[in-house]
Design a protein with these regions (language model features):
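Charged alpha-helical initiation segments
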Residues: 1-70, 82, 87, 94-95, ...
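Helix-loop junctions and short alpha-helical segments
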Residues: 71-72, 79, 84-181
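Structural signal for well-ordered, non-membrane alpha-helices
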Residues: 43, 76-77
Length: 181
């Protein structure tokens, strides 16, 4: 019987042109609208989960609840990424105050070359932000806190608006942290 050759062939790499898409920058009201729509979709599934559980399909209802947690985290992550993109562009355009974290962003030479060739065009900056933050998940307290600091957003103010309760004993920042973690 003839022996088969099971050696692996070297594979060609980097032979296709990279796919390039234009980075979209939403306005604040659009970012909020997308977030609100995601929350409404998540809330609508509570009715479905409740109906399943009431009809004896407990596992199916609980699966919807688990999926809602993932969808909620995804909605927050999208919101934070878009807020970051929006805020950094506002800082870049000098509409918002610069922050220490903004001034210390790491930019490699390839990005600088593109920026210099782009003139007044801001697309290079949007692409840089998108590439820099795309692998970072922004759903933990620490990541949200870091993004707020980068953008000059007062975390205590946000926590107070979201979680203040008259005669409450827990600090609003601690509640904020507990909810995200």
């Amino acid at each position: 019987m003839e022996e088969r050759n099971l050696d692996l062939e070297a594979r060609n790499e980097d032979i296709r042109d990279k796919f390039h898409t234009n980075v979209v920058r939403f306005e604040l009201d659009q970012i909020m609208q997308h977030f609100d729509e995601a929350i409404q979709t998540i809330n609508a599934q509570f009715v479905v989960a409740d109906e399943l559980i009431e009809s004896g399909k407990v596992n199916e209802g609980e699966n919807i609840w688990r999926a809602q947690i993932i969808f909620l985290a995804s909605a927050l992550d999208f919101y934070m990424h878009e807020l970051t993109k929006y805020g950094l562009c506002e800082i870049y355009n000098e509409n918002w105050d610069r922050t220490d974290k903004y001034e210390n962003l790491k930019v490699n030479m390839k990005v600088i070359e593109v920026a210099l060739k782009s003139g007044e065009d801001i697309d290079w900056f949007l692409e840089y932000i998108n590439n820099y933050y795309r692998a970072i998940t922004m759903i933990s307290y620490e990541s949200v806190k870091d993004q707020f600091k980068l953008l000059g957003i007062n975390l205590a103010h946000i926590a107070d608006r979201a979680f203040y309760q008259r005669e409450g004993t827990e600090r609003t920042k601690d509640k904020f942290k507990r909810r995200l973690n």
